[in-house]
């Protein structure tokens, strides 16, 4: 999340460098979480994994919406890293589902998955610029809940 350094700087009064270092904990989680999401998906089932990870990221962003300047910095970092685990693992699990949606269009679906991820990044940065930070995180949590409900209707082909 490219807005996290700004969030930590504004919320905790950190220097730009310190805020960037703290926010890097979110990106650091990507190293194990994204492949881990794919692994979990392979092991326990794609749809079930996506449902659990999407519920987890909704809870994670709900937690992020509660972070404030009265929180200890370590607790805010812990919530961000927990939230990041579900987001990054969810990304790995999403790409595990791509070939199971419509096998004849796997490439197109993979391309759209990546493209719409970038569209989401732009939309959420605009939301961050216009909403109070707690409402911004609640917006993401609410979107995750909508995603969860949508996943309930997901049909996968069986190879």
Regions found by a protein language model. Give the residues of each.
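Extracytoplasmic gate region of multi-pass secondary transporters
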Residues: 1-27
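Cytoplasmic membrane-interface "Motif A"-like loop-to-helix N-cap segments
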Residues: 43-54
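Intracellular juxtamembrane helix-capping segments at the cytosolic ends
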Residues: 89-102
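Residue-level signature of mid-helix packing/kink "hotspots" within the transmembrane helices
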Residues: 27-35, 118, 122
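Symmetry-related core transmembrane helices of the 12-TM Major Facilitator Superfamily/SLC fold
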Residues: 136-153
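Conserved small/polar residues in nucleotide/adenosyl-binding loops
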Residues: 157-159
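C-terminal ends and interior cores of transmembrane alpha-helices
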Residues: 55-69
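Helix-to-loop junctions at the C-terminal end of transmembrane segments
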Residues: 33-45
């Amino acid at each position: 999340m490219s807005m996290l350094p700004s969030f930590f700087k504004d919320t905790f009064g950190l220097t730009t460098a310190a805020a960037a270092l703290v926010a890097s904990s979110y990106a650091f989680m990507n190293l194990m979480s994204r492949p881990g999401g794919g692994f979990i998906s392979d092991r326990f089932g794609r749809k079930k994994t996506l449902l659990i990870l999407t519920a987890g990221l909704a809870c994670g962003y709900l937690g992020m919406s509660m972070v404030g300047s009265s929180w200890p910095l370590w607790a805010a970092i812990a919530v961000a890293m927990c939230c990041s685990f579900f987001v990054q693992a969810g990304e790995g699990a999403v790409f595990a589902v791509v070939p199971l949606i419509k096998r004849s269009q796997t490439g197109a679906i993979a391309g759209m998955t990546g493209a719409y991820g970038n569209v989401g990044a732009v939309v959420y940065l605009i939301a961050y610029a216009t909403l109070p930070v707690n409402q911004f995180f609640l917006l993401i949590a609410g979107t995750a809940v909508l995603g969860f409900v949508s996943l309930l209707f997901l049909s996968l082909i069986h190879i």
